[in-house]
């Protein structure tokens, strides 16, 4: 047996091999030692009498999914080695083989995962022009593909998808390996694709880009190789361009806490937490997808808004629809299990009950006065035949296992009914035999029983053994207080009953497989229905949230970038505050205002105001209503943020480097259609350095980018920029001082703040009084010194147009200052440099090389 084990293990050296032996899956050697530690199993040894006993640990086959999930959740792979023949009928060694390789990206059992989470496997291929990327959730069969120009873009997509595993076709650089490790992404090699596969041809039929085709073929090939079965539920790959949606980096999504709180990593405290009123797992997953990819297409946005408006206006339509949706199970994943062949009878009944809810939903929609709802209903196929087929074939409460009978209703199959009659008649005969034998022997407590080891038997207590007719009874088993016997007639009827039972069980399983295969024919229709119900679930949720929180329907204009939000609110902050206590604020930025320079004390609400604007924009572009009295918005193509102070552990960057990298991304790639949020730029370095950088960034945003930008700062000197920058406007968050106490007004007011109230905020934070007294003394001393210096309006000469100097070099006079080849090469290197793809250490090394080249050139 161990030779067979070692031969199979050679093929899967990087996976835990679960080797089936009887009712257990066994782990051996290093797998056993490591597995016992992780899974808290008892470590034993095989061949204890030898000098080198083999470490061994096992898990019951009935509970194997739990143990597999635990290992895969920790990033390991598990190869399931099954017995491929009945051990009782095997000649010699039982034939075994791998039936499935479970990996982080292919795990279908939810385990500890939230049912509203997707589990993506991603395939990446390198090409001459960049990268092809495709990803899939095996449990639902969905597949998407795109092509990207840089590994930085690939990295961002992987983080945004929260992918668990990447199939990569080439060697990774050390930097890429480090990224994958820190992002907790398992990297797997592609598997060779031999011959033609129907799944691959079907999936890639609509793809035209070569890189996307390669990535998709690699993805499906890996799935076929690891799952070792037909994957009929894989859907046609949908190609997308990242610029088809409102683009937000993974960092931006985290900063804005779209699906998880930045502090806890949990749902509570996120935008998803506020908006998720879905009642199905597939609706929850779809909502997450929408939040990650807000739309740019106004027509699609307007359609979603119309659906939400109709459900908001039609209270009874919405409530009846929601009540029916509560009875809908996860159609997408049930369909995946049907295709996968591991669906059980209870899950098929869940599918049937889900389908039985669809006519109720259609009735609710069709009774509405809204054309958009009735049109939506017309596109839904309720698949009544599938629901009826399942419900009339399976019993109401079938067992969990499909191999032990008790699945199929009476009357479904005539042969099955005959077997059942034989079993029932045999059992009636046993009851009658027990009565007859009591009378014949005079043993009142005589019993006829059954167990799997000895079959049917007659049990007599020790006190009545003397009455046993040994001429007819043969002793079978001795117990402490009784003896068990058999008779020729009992043995004959046992054979008849057990044969009927075995044949009945086998036939039931065959009938169940036939039912499953028949339902499998409807997989595309079931997937389409699942998508429709998921969308309807999200629409109902949006309508419910809008009603509960008094949201408004936003409008859009495509001919300008004007923003007009009246009494806007932060959707998350509002929910955690006492009802009615949130102070709303307007955001009004017309063609004469591109930048809001926001000042005010810490804790006053600057960051909340900025995030509020971004979240309103995102909510609007996914089709939700928004927290405001009214909102007229442009369609934003990108959102950039620099909010919060934290080191980037994944890329190994310091706080200041993160700050500069995020600022650079906005300065490089933002357009006039973008939204930029910068909070406290420059605080990670010396005061004057920070002030200089902040001022220069504001000026660049104003002069070169032209995006709508909200720029919060503590550098009050920057407020004089409105004298030279026409499209910049100063606003501040109001605060007042009463009886020595600072009171935040949380209201946005025009003009700059008159002071920062830093010491007051420190007092609110509970700093020691001695520290506060010393800070007050130092502040007065600095203010006294500052009064002797130039006024604030003159302190920003750094950002003013420099006066011409007599020794100034004329950059345009190339004849007087010709550029050397070395200088030109350095300039070209800098022009082509993509900073977001480099670490600080790499940049320092590049600068050192440039310095050396220029010195050598002299």
From Swiss-Prot:
One of its GO terms (cellular component) is cytosol. Gene3D superfamilies: 1.10.1420.10, DNA repair protein MutS, domain I, MutS, connector domain, P-loop containing nucleotide triphosphate hydrolases. GO terms for biological process: mismatch repair. SUPFAM superfamilies: DNA repair protein MutS, domain I, DNA repair protein MutS, domain II, DNA repair protein MutS, domain III, P-loop containing nucleoside triphosphate hydrolases. This is DNA mismatch repair protein MutS. InterPro entries: DNA_mismatch_repair_MutS, DNA_mismatch_repair_MutS-lik_N, DNA_mismatch_repair_MutS/MSH, DNA_mismatch_repair_MutS_C, DNA_mismatch_repair_MutS_clamp, DNA_mismatch_repair_MutS_core, DNA_mismatch_repair_MutS_N, DNA_mismatch_repair_MutS_sf. NCBIfam families: mutS1 (TIGR01070), PRK05399.1 (NF003810).
